[in-house]
């Protein structure tokens, strides 16, 4: 089964995708995690994405689509997947069609603006492995330190206070 989860940043797409992924035994494909992994491993697309990510800008559709094509071609996606954060634009949606990807269900998560602000302003991400935390709802065991790899947790560059407000 191929699913898409839509919603504003902080709506809970990643949280819900994780639950569904475990229940259906299909991978959660997060655009953000894919991009961070491509940057970390220094792939061709990762090198291209790094400059945009470092400045807090959105990565171009061509780069995101290229990374997604590579990801859904992997063996663990043969029985389905959950797209979390993709598509974000008409060209990205058209790319799914052009790839011949059949989407079985699209779920959109609606959350009030005030809740979104509260969720996003408390989010933290590990500099090392990309694990996500929230200072109120899902804190790390030691404040500012990733439970998984021990690296520092930070506010994502695309979620600084100005972009939240």
Language model: regions and residue ranges:
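Glycine-rich phosphate-binding loop of ATP-dependent small-molecule kinases
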Residues: 1-165
